[in-house]
Amino acid sequence: MNKKQKKVLARIIIAVVLMIILHFIPVKGIIRFLLYMVPYLVIGYDILKKAFKGIKNKQVFDENFLMAVATVGAIAVALYENGDYTEAIAVMLFYQIGELFQSYAVGKSRKNISELMDIRPDYANIEVDGKLTQVDPDEVVIGSVIVVQPGEKVPIDGVIVDGSSTLNTSALTGESVPRDAKCGDEIISGCINMSGVLKIKTTKEFGESTVSKILDLVENSSSKKSKSENFISKFAKYYTPAVCYSALALAILPPIVRILFMSAEPQWGIWIYRALTFLVISCPCALVISIPLSFFAGIGGASREGVLVKGSNYLETLSQTRYVVFDKTGTMTEGVFEVAGVYDNTLDREKVIEYAALAESSSSHPISRSLQKAYGKEIDRNRVTDIEEISGHGITAKVDGISVAAGNYKLMKKLGLSYSETDKVGTIVHIAIDGSYEGYILISDKIKPTSAAAIKALKKAGIKGTIMLTGDSRTVADSVAAELGIDEVYSELLPGDKVAKVEELLARKGSKEKLAFVGDGINDAPVLSRADIGIAMGAMGSDAAIEAADIVLMDDDPLKIAKAIKISRKCLRIVYENTYFAIGIKLICLVLGAVGIANMWLAIFADVGVMVIAVLNAIRALFVHKL
């Protein structure tokens, strides 16, 4: 509980004690009025001050105005009729109790999220003259060597140049299993070093590091509001003035009707009391507070599981997802390619791999990296000239002055060369050297252990269609799709074809159904942007993924996709529960108040009680671990 909350609690206790004491003091008239004004002002002076400031700034209609008018009106009625000021003070007292509870609940939610996302490093260690010096992470330049001791957070992305350790990545991924890290491994900020001392050569500035990107994403998520939140904001804008005018009509019209048409007593006191009760009931706090809190808690609960949502609008869209489109490589498969064999070659296996690795040396594609890994020697780029990358086909280059072509069967066709056809499952890289076909290299990629379970989980979650897009051959694509149980597969696609295919799938679905695209974020930015919702997987260290996607999964587990959808649906379910509950109770109590059945005590429940219940319900969105 912060200082401000403690102050409000103290005022509540003082007001309650004063009311109990006053209950046993038998005074009447103006002295009774003055005595009861003490607890009223103790508990309500800030509300009156805010209401007056709102009137002064021409922002009249808010909950402070409603409470001020209702309580001042109740005091006026009591002053001229029965001298019972208890109800007026009770309205203000319980309103403040509700506000305190709401403030504490929101603070608790924020604290939970900030603890879960407690990855911001306070300092970085730099070795100066053999001694460790703590500096601000912002001051560390690229290429510096920082030292991370056991128990410390890794402050900046880099590469380990000395030492080995285990890393706790739970704040980023939601997974508690430690990861081993050794010399030569890339390491990202936000992890906690658990055992050995690590020396890390930084590859980014702090502002561009993973930890900064994630914190920026989480902090800005509240600015992107959902349709539900925007509706509530607009609703409150028109609702509050409407109920104020309705209360005014309730106070004035019935007495006038009684005088003019019924020749009866106007009963001003009764109708003013009903109007004031009507005002207290109508306060929209439960909706205005609980709806944004539900989304805030939902985003916080998701971040706890390593699912970063860029805004409540994306959480709302995700809940309506009925079709999920996957990229194959790095999403459903490991994306770690290895050379499985060289076939139909006339040259030595090593020579074929050498030519292929050198020709592909300028590419950062995983297949190129696998060829370079199989070659196993340092790449001498001076040996390679005239490199030309042909999109969707492969690469041509000159190695030691000899022309080399490495790519798929389309490249061989383009060059007018006959090639070997095969039904082997894997990525086939055909090789032509000096205008002659020299066989093919088979490169394999393993399916992730949780991919099949992820597809089952999505279908169980009500996803109508699972679709896989890949640039791989039809044989490989069909084999992977069959093994995983994916409904549709489209293979041999060029990068531009994926966007066109997603456009086609978007046109095919229902107007209220949403389509999500899941990729590894490396080459998928256009498709991630085009889908209704873009989900990037394995985004630890990938700036492109964090920038392009609407939702970021911090690790490589495809099971998190179904979990993210379940989290979004739980959050939206809570939003609808709070909306229907708050509006339903208020409508019933408004009718009861207007006809004189509901008194001020029921009005307090309809306002404060409903708000407390709605806030408690909203906080449930934080707890998503068992989904």
Q: Which positions does each model-derived feature cover?
A:
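Conserved cytosolic catalytic loops of P-type ATPases
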Residues: 115-208, 313-356, 398
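Conserved ATP-binding TGD loop and adjacent catalytic N/P-domain core of P-type ATPases
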Residues: 401, 427, 433-577, 585
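Transmembrane helix-loop-helix hairpins at the membrane interface
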Residues: 2-123, 234, 241
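Juxtamembrane coupling segments of multi-pass membrane pumps/enzymes
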Residues: 65, 90-150, 181, 306-309, ...
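P-type ATPase nucleotide-binding
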Residues: 339-465, 474, 486-502
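Soluble-to-membrane junctions at the N-terminal ends of transmembrane alpha-helices
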Residues: 1-14, 45-75, 215-249, 321, ...
